[in-house]
């Protein structure tokens, strides 16, 4: 980006904020057309700042910014409305989604489909069982980031996954039929793999096994570094 470039009316969500100097904030956002962007919100911590009541996580915003460095300058933010405030477990799950985006996405790498998946997940978190919502988002995240998560073809033979067979998932290879020396790897049924490929988490076994499989994959791509939000939610057994 050049120093003079300005972005206007960009749909975005706030992922994280932290204080900067005496009265300002650095705001990490996830935008539809520009991906994850860091912005300085000058004076946002002042009591009378127009930005103070707008820069909120999990709320759909329209944002204007300018600048060409790694950290841009926030010019304007407008609340778009329509998203209920998250509370309780739904709120903690929202923090989990945000942490995944901060840790796994690159700066200024646009993923419009991932943006829509994130917006959909936020809108659904307060309405019922959060587990299927989290699993769909995790799967979309890994696919959108180009990790090539194959689910419907066997990794060693390229044959269609058999719903009645048992598999282990080998990272960078895919599902392989379970053998005697595969102890220690999470097993997954062929039916679960096919359900995941179609985004169907209605079966209890699929929901249980997909949680273990997606955790294995996410931990790998995080380089084994723990997620703070997952530690907080461990006792709630939602992640």
Swiss-Prot record:
The keyword Iron does not apply. GO terms for biological process: DNA recombination; double-strand break repair. The keyword DNA repair applies. Disulfide bonds: none annotated. Keywords: DNA damage, DNA recombination, DNA repair. GO terms for cellular component: bacterial nucleoid. InterPro entries: ARFGAP/RecO, DNA_rep/recomb_RecO_N, NA-bd_OB-fold, RecO, RecO_C. Belongs to the RecO family. PANTHER family: DNA REPAIR PROTEIN RECO. Involved in DNA repair and RecF pathway recombination. This is DNA repair protein RecO. It comes from Aromatoleum aromaticum (strain DSM 19018 / LMG 30748 / EbN1). The gene is recO.
């Amino acid at each position: 980006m050049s120093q003079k470039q300005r972005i206007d009316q960009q749909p975005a969500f706030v992922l994280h904020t932290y204080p900067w100097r005496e009265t300002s904030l650095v705001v990490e956002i996830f935008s539809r057309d520009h991906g994850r962007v860091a912005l300085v919100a000058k004076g946002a911590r002042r009591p009378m700042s127009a930005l103070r009541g707008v820069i909120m996580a999990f709320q759909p915003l329209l944002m204007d910014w300018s600048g060409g460095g790694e950290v841009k300058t926030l010019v304007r933010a407008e609340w778009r409305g329509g998203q209920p405030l998250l509370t309780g477990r739904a709120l903690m799950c929202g923090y989990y989604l945000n942490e995944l985006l901060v840790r796994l996405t690159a700066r200024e790498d646009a993923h419009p489909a991932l943006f829509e998946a994130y917006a959909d997940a936020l809108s659904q978190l307060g309405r019922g069982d959060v587990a299927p919502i989290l699993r769909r988002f995790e799967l979309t995240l890994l696919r959108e980031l180009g990790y090539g998560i194959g689910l419907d073809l066997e990794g060693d033979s390229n044959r269609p996954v058999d719903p009645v067979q048992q598999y282990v998932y080998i990272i960078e290879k895919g599902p392989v039929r379970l053998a005697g020396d595969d102890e220690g790897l999470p097993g997954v049924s062929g039916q679960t793999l096919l359900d995941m490929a179609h985004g169907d988490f209605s079966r209890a076994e699929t929901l249980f096994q997909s949680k273990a499989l997606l955790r294995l994959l996410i931990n790998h791509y995080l380089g084994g570094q723990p997620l703070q939000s997952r530690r907080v939610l461990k006792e709630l057994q939602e992640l």
